[in-house]
Amino acid sequence: MNCWELLLAAWSTCFFSVPSDGLQRIVLKKMTSIQENMKIRGKDLENFNMDWNSYVKQLSELNETATVVVTNFEDTQYYGEVNIGSPPQTFRVVFDTGSADFWVPSSRCDPLYTACRKILALEYQVIHNQYDFSKSSTYKDNGTKFSIHYASGRVKGFLSQDTVTIGGISMTQVFGEVTVLPLMPFGLARFDGILGLGYPARSMSGILPVFDNMISQGVLKEEVFSVYYSRNSMNSHLPSGEIVLGGTDPDYYRGTFHYVNTSRPGFWHIQMKGVAIKSNVLLCQDSCTASVDTGASFITGPTSSMRKLMKTLGVKEEGDQYLIECDLAPTLPDISFYFDGKAFTLNSSDYVLQDMKSLDNLCLLTFDNLDIPPPTGPLWILGATFIRKFYTKFDRHNNRIGFALAV
């Protein structure tokens, strides 16, 4: 066997071997969120949040049936890597159950937009990888234009086709090349693009979502993916997070899954039958809709409900944040969320963050106000704060979400 045959054999083993458990995995890494990045550089996040909520409201008033992706990416902390093209071009993407489209910045991104300029890296230390079709031998032109309204801004571009590799699975995929990218939040993000894990009905570009492409090709053990976020960044034998395609990993949870059927076709929405402090049900006595969203970090809810919850806890609202003296954080009570009669409980160590660099002895609660108007809202969003505590299984075949206590 000559050297080229040896190289080919080694390459095939690395890229096409099938794991013994039949599952494919995407390692997730933790990053500095946009919120943290702005705080470090003394930028005014409060004004951004006011503009962001105003933007959602304006869209709903323009068209009551307008579809808006409600994920607030400014607090997103986890990303994974995907490869596009031949040879591969690597991108950091947020895997988002709140949307269904897949896009990355294009090398043809309009320099009139600040987020497309390389000079952005000098001020915010953010460098975005851009897809260059001319460097890929497997690229195919599509050219269809698309526009996606996120709660935090709008991206625009055109569709292209190329080989995409995710979690060891390679396939031909249509995706978006973004040429219009707003500075807030995407220009300041540590990630490059978004890979939606929502249902096909959520796709605003009209393309077949990545997960559905995998299903159609029969490469998954089950029509399921599961999400793990490490609860302890110092836990060296586990990654910061992982998405398991085709099933679940028993090393990431204890006990069994409790399943909740989705409440709205085409959405990862479930009915929440109560929010309680200790055993006292304070909110959602008559049911609320909750979205389990891997693209979000905090737990968000309608302003009136969130303020009632925080007031009961004795927590003060400062600007756009809920803060408490760190010395008092351990005294905060448990908060429970009820699904189909079962309580999923967070204690204070699950929902309070301490900034070790802060000099004011104030800790941040990972709750936030978010008023989403009809027809999508009102809506609660359960982000990483919840998923870190409960390993989450998204079951497309049975249209349900399962929760198990994470390790």
Language model segments and positions:
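Aspartic protease catalytic domain
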Residues: N2-N37, D44, E74-T76, G85-P87, ...
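Signature of the N-terminal lobe/flap region of pepsin-like aspartyl proteases
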Residues: S60-V69, F73-R190, Y322, S336, ...
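Acidic glycine-/aspartate-rich tracts in secreted/extracellular proteins
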Residues: R108-D110, A201, D249-D251, S305
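Charged, amphipathic alpha-helical segments
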Residues: G143-S147, I207-N213, T312-E325
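C-terminal reverse transcriptase regions that engage the nucleic-acid substrate
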Residues: G196
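Extended, H/D-rich, highly charged conserved domains that either
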Residues: Y199, V219-N232, S236-G246
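Flexible, small-/acidic-enriched active-site or ligand-binding loops
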Residues: L238-S287
